[in-house]
Design a protein with these regions (language model features):
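Glycine-rich phosphate-binding/hydrolytic loop that grips phosphoryl groups
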Residues: 170-194
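Glycine-rich phosphate-binding loops at beta-strand->alpha-helix junctions
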Residues: 139-158
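Short hydrophobic/aromatic-enriched beta-strand-loop microsegments
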Residues: 40-46, 163-172
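Gly/Ser/Thr-rich loops at beta-strand to alpha-helix junctions
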Residues: 24-30, 148-152
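Adenine-nucleotide phosphate-binding core of ATP-dependent small-molecule kinases
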Residues: 85-128
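Glycine-rich phosphate-binding loop plus the immediately following alpha-helix
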Residues: 1-21, 30-86
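Short glycine-aspartate micro-motif
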Residues: 20-24, 144
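Phosphate/pyrophosphate-binding loops at sites that engage ATP/ADP/AMP, CoA/4′-phosphopantetheine
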Residues: 126-139
């Protein structure tokens, strides 16, 4: 499967002898736990990217965010964490409606509201990771976040804000090399196909 092959590419770069949590964000955010010996011990996938797309384009919130996703130049850590914290207290649905209220009566800036909604959409993933029976993680687990900005940075900022994991790192592959291709190459090489 895709996330496992992508994970192999990331694992090749992080042979630390410590347990890892690989975070591969996208329309389906993928979380893969790896033990200290480098074996995958669990996977968790969410549809938070799809939920964010639906909220941004197909709900009453679409106007509040200008039907725009957060871009690198509009990324706002403060508003992201406000959305995250609000969703942690009141849930995704209520937080999204709060975004509309904020836009109408407090801050008529769609990029800020989009960051607020992004934080809310990602909150459930953090709860899932921390309480999952599928993943094996502890505060000593090194988190490696891949993907593209601003999503990569948003996840790093949220995990640092949450404070559970002691080490959070990012992984950016070389220009022009996809994680899937690199992982498939490594699998083929290990199995003597290449």
């Amino acid at each position: 499967r895709g996330e496992e092959v992508e994970s192999i590419a990331v694992m090749e770069q992080f042979k630390s002898g410590r347990p890892l949590l690989l975070v591969l964000p996208g329309s389906h955010n993928k979380f893969v736990s790896v033990d200290a010996e480098g074996k995958m011990t669990g996977c968790l996938t969410s549809i938070s990217g799809e939920l964010l797309a639906s909220i941004t384009n197909d709900t009453i919130i679409a106007k509040s965010v200008g039907k725009q996703f957060v871009e690198e130049e509009t990324y706002d850590r403060e508003w992201l964490l406000k959305g995250y914290d609000n969703a942690k207290r009141t849930g995704l649905g209520r937080t999204c409606f709060t975004a509309r209220i904020l836009q109408l009566f407090y801050e008529d800036a769609p990029p800020k509201i989009a960051n607020f909604v992004l934080g809310a959409a990602l909150q459930g993933d953090v709860t899932a990771v921390l309480h999952s029976d599928a993943l094996k993680v502890s505060p000593d687990t090194t988190v490696v976040v891949g993907g593209k900005n601003p999503l990569r940075q948003a996840i790093v900022d949220i995990l640092e804000h949450e404070g559970y994991f002691a080490r959070i790192e990012t992984y950016v592959p070389e220009e022009g090399i996809s994680l899937s291709a690199l992982g498939a190459y490594l699998v083929a090489e290990k199995n003597g196909i290449l």
